[in-house]
């Protein structure tokens, strides 16, 4: 019986790196952010263009323009999620079906808003990636194009880290470097029966 792992963590916590560590241990990983970026170049385009006119260019969603629309009216986030989340779920289900056919012991869904979207009900175990708030802030503000305002807007839409940790089956502390995180990933897989 395949175990579906849901990986989550607030922005700048080291989730992408941790997902790579699971992949290096042979776990198939689906990155929900990458799925969304793909949808922004494919089937979500006409739906987003209809909901938010002027946010697409040359058959692709212009993420800058879409971001401006969302910042002007945060209620638009819900409308966008109503469009995108079902499409993402379809991709996740196809990914999990393939992993089952391939007789994998584990499959990992990397879902930034796992708790916020109720996705924990679709996974067997939840792993939360966390680190100290000052490390998180430093990581995020060093990203190209990131501002304090954008960071605060993203944080406001995410469940507080302490609550995520409390609801997790496992927590990976990414604040002590990649090798320490790798050891934690291996330990989680051992506990789950790898």
Swiss-Prot record:
GO terms for cellular component: cytoplasm. It is an enzyme of class 2 (transferase). Keywords: ATP-binding, Coenzyme A biosynthesis, Cytoplasm, Kinase, Nucleotide-binding, Transferase. CDD domains: DPCK. Residues 4-194 form the DPCK domain. It is found in: Cytoplasm. Pfam families: CoaE. Belongs to the CoaE family. This is Dephospho-CoA kinase.
């Amino acid at each position: 019986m395949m175990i579906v792992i849901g990986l989550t963590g607030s922005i700048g916590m080291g989730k992408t790196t941790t997902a790579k560590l699971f992949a290096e241990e042979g776990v198939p990983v689906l990155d929900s952010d990458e799925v969304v970026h793909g949808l922004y170049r494919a089937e979500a385009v006409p739906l987003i263009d209809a909901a938010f006119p002027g946010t697409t260019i040359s058959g692709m969603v212009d993420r800058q323009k879409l971001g401006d629309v969302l910042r002007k009216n945060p209620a638009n986030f819900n409308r966008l999620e109503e469009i995108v989340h079902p499409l993402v779920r379809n991709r996740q289900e196809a990914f999990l079906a393939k992993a089952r056919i391939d007789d994998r012991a584990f499959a990992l869904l990397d879902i930034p808003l796992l708790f916020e979207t109720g996705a924990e009900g679709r996974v067997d175990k939840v792993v939360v990636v966390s680190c100290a708030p000052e490390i998180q802030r430093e990581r995020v503000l060093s990203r190209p194009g990131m501002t304090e305002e954008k960071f605060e807007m993203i944080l406001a839409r995410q469940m507080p880290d302490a609550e995520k940790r409390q609801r997790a089956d496992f927590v990976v502390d990414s604040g002590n470097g990649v090798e320490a995180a790798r050891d934690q990933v291996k330990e989680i897989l051992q506990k789950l029966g790898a």
